[in-house]
């Protein structure tokens, strides 16, 4: 249901109709675009690697030796003109990216343009230092990070407009030291981006704001198109994987509130595999997300960033990831991206851009 507004009923009806049309347009682009498998390079080779690999994929209880990295998780070294260009622009504007801070294995493909030649980067707002210390994440932590850069919303919008993208992902560190968790800062950034290009799709991968629903509403009502918040792991493992201030049920509450406050948003979450979860627990997490109104889901392999972080319990096979993709579709997710190297913002821009181009060709 729409929230009650101080406006005539006729305006409410027109607003609801406009938002519904916008949502349907986004869904149409998603459904008519390529599926996730279209973006995987050398998929045939990956299948051969899986079928011929005889290495150990799971650590048994009590074992301390690290698992050997299977061939389907090996990626190329970041390089190329596009990669260098984006890195230079980000440094000049003093912007951070989760691609670098979280040591994403896809940085070379996304920044370099990959097979399809499209540059994709995920901007990380509010600095590079988080107030939380999740045991899977390599982003720096501190109780009192540096103050927010008041110029960041404008600088971010300038950078994005110069790249000419159709889709951009904004994420952020947690800022529990701020009264509003930085929600107003994120919302201002979205508005600056939309002011320069009203046609761009903006996805925000945001914190839980410690369950503060006013902060959730600030983001949900700022003009973004996709509200993302990651559940990360199954309920049983949450206390051991995420920071103590992050809670499984709180994540579901945040995602549900965003959807209830603005029903025309697409909501999205992400799940890491390989931390010791069972198939039944993964299934239940997917069901919980659907019940909370989540429409998009990504599943990827957890990879230990440093020796200080949680060890990998299991390297999940591409075949199993394919199973979860199919299960997500059966459960009614708008789309499910599931693969060993999938991350919450992996190839998001390229997905939408390719989809848009495909639709334009059909209409010619």
UniProtKB/Swiss-Prot annotation:
Pathway as given in its UniProt record: Protein modification; protein lipoylation via endogenous pathway; protein N(6)-(lipoyl)lysine from octanoyl-[acyl-carrier-protein]: step 2/2
Gene3D superfamilies: Aldolase class I
Reaction equation(s) it catalyzes: [[Fe-S] cluster scaffold protein carrying a second [4Fe-4S](2+) cluster] + N(6)-octanoyl-L-lysyl-[protein] + 2 oxidized [2Fe-2S]-[ferredoxin] + 2 S-adenosyl-L-methionine + 4 H(+) = [[Fe-S] cluster scaffold protein] + N(6)-[(R)-dihydrolipoyl]-L-lysyl-[protein] + 4 Fe(3+) + 2 hydrogen sulfide + 2 5'-deoxyadenosine + 2 L-methionine + 2 reduced [2Fe-2S]-[ferredoxin]
Cofactor note: Binds 2 [4Fe-4S] clusters per subunit. One cluster is coordinated with 3 cysteines and an exchangeable S-adenosyl-L-methionine.
Positions annotated to bind [4Fe-4S] cluster 1: 99, 104, 110, 345
PROSITE patterns documented for this protein: RADICAL_SAM
Gene Ontology, cellular component aspect: mitochondrion
Binding, [4Fe-4S] cluster 2: 130, 134, 137
InterPro entries (UniProt xref): Aldolase_TIM (IPR013785), Elp3/MiaA/NifB-like_rSAM (IPR006638), LIAS_N (IPR031691), Lipoyl_synth (IPR003698), rSAM (IPR007197)
Classification via CDD domains: Radical_SAM
Enzyme Commission no: 2.8.1.8
Keyword Lipid metabolism included in the entry's annotation: no
Family: Belongs to the radical SAM superfamily. Lipoyl synthase family.
Listed name of the protein: Lipoyl synthase, mitochondrial
Annotated organism of origin: Drosophila grimshawi
